[in-house]
């Protein structure tokens, strides 16, 4: 089935839903395609404490649900589908989805966000889903009263470690440097938590486990200076080393930098293709916060309205 629209938004995180709210309020009747992970990365975050307007801690999934309801209430059509292919060679742009629908849009706002990075070692792939995860809120419950390793040193890693103490007996954070880059408030909480210990200047060399049944039993960690290898016993490994922007759909059709982020014009959400805009983590390699994603979604919506009114 072919569907036409003035504005099509790809992605439903803070950027996509903010873009939807603002384009809908401009009477542009936007269509938003949810994607494979409706709500984006915030649906995998428990406590949200830094989103303005909430004096008390809120839950990430709840915040995204409220944004989605608001977008619908002002006139956004939200489609539970995912995009398989796009054609940005000329307007109207063509979008093909997994359910077989074809959309033609006068403008597109790309808000496909980013996904978790992995270590890239063979044993990680072998035990993914059998003790290796990148989502504490999704899988933490399965490690009740067990020992867990968290890999990383940014906000995500520390948030995961702190959350996992609700379930685990002990959480060990393995970081390749000798200091964290996470916010100080998170570091303070982590260092005060008796369930958490930190191993500095180490990387994961191998994840070890059993095949009968298939489970993780530990990690071999390597000192980055001496190359000495030691074994840390654990039942689960949570990888929190950052994210990769979801731009594969647009390869060869739009300007993308060496880190796979969509290139937007300075101070704008305009991309290299006229009529195509990008907002949120798919184009932001510096801030990567929910509030900045939402703000860039607003910017994209205002720029789309101006573009369509030419």
UniProtKB/Swiss-Prot annotation:
EC code(s) of this entry: 1.8.1.9
Keyword Repeat: no
Keywords: Cytoplasm, Disulfide bond, FAD, Flavoprotein, NADP, Oxidoreductase, Redox-active center
Disulfide topology: 135-138
Coiled-coil intervals: none
Cellular component per GO, a single term: cytoplasm
Reactions listed under catalytic activity: [thioredoxin]-dithiol + NADP(+) = [thioredoxin]-disulfide + NADPH + H(+)
Cofactor binding annotation: Binds 1 FAD per subunit.
GO MF assignments: thioredoxin-disulfide reductase (NADPH) activity
Subcellular location: Cytoplasm
Subunit annotation: Homodimer.
PANTHER family (alphabetical): THIOREDOXIN REDUCTASE 1-RELATED-RELATED
Extra remark: The active site is a redox-active disulfide bond.
Listed name of the protein: Thioredoxin reductase
Protein's organism: Rickettsia typhi (strain ATCC VR-144 / Wilmington)
């Amino acid at each position: 089935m072919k569907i036409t629209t003035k504005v099509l938004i790809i992605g439903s995180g803070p950027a996509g839903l903010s873009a939807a709210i603002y384009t809908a309020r401009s009477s542009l009747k936007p269509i938003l395609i949810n994607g494979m992970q409706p709500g984006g990365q915030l649906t995998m975050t428990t406590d949200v404490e830094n989103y303005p307007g909430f004096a008390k801690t809120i839950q990430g999934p709840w915040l995204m649900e409220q944004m989605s309801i608001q977008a619908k209430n002002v006139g956004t059509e939200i489609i539970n589908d995912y995009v398989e292919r796009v054609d940005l060679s000329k307007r109207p742009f063509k979008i093909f989805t997994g359910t077989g629908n074809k959309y033609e849009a006068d403008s597109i706002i790309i808000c496909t966000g980013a996904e978790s990075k992995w270590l890239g070692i063979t044993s990680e792939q072998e035990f993914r889903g059998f003790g290796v995860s990148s989502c504490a809120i999704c899988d933490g419950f399965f490690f009740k009263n067990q020992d867990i390793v968290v890999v990383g040193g940014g906000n995500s890693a520390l948030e995961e470690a702190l959350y996992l103490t609700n379930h685990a007996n002990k959480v060990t954070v393995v970081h390749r440097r000798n200091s964290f880059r996470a916010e100080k408030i998170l570091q303070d909480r982590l260092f005060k938590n008796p369930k958490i210990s930190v191993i500095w200047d180490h990387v994961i060399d191998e994840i070890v486990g059993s095949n009968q049944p298939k489970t993780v039993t530990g990690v071999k960690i390597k000192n980055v200076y001496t190359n000495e290898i030691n074994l840390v016993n654990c039942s689960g490994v949570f990888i929190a080393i950052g994210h990769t922007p979801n731009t594969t759909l647009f390869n060869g059709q739009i300007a993308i930098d060496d880190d796979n982020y969509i290139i937007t014009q300075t101070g704008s959400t305009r991309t290299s293709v006229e009529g195509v805009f990008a907002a949120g983590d798919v184009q932001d390699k510096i801030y990567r916060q929910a509030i900045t994603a939402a703000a860039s979604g607003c910017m994209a919506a205002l720029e789309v309205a101006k573009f369509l009114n030419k």
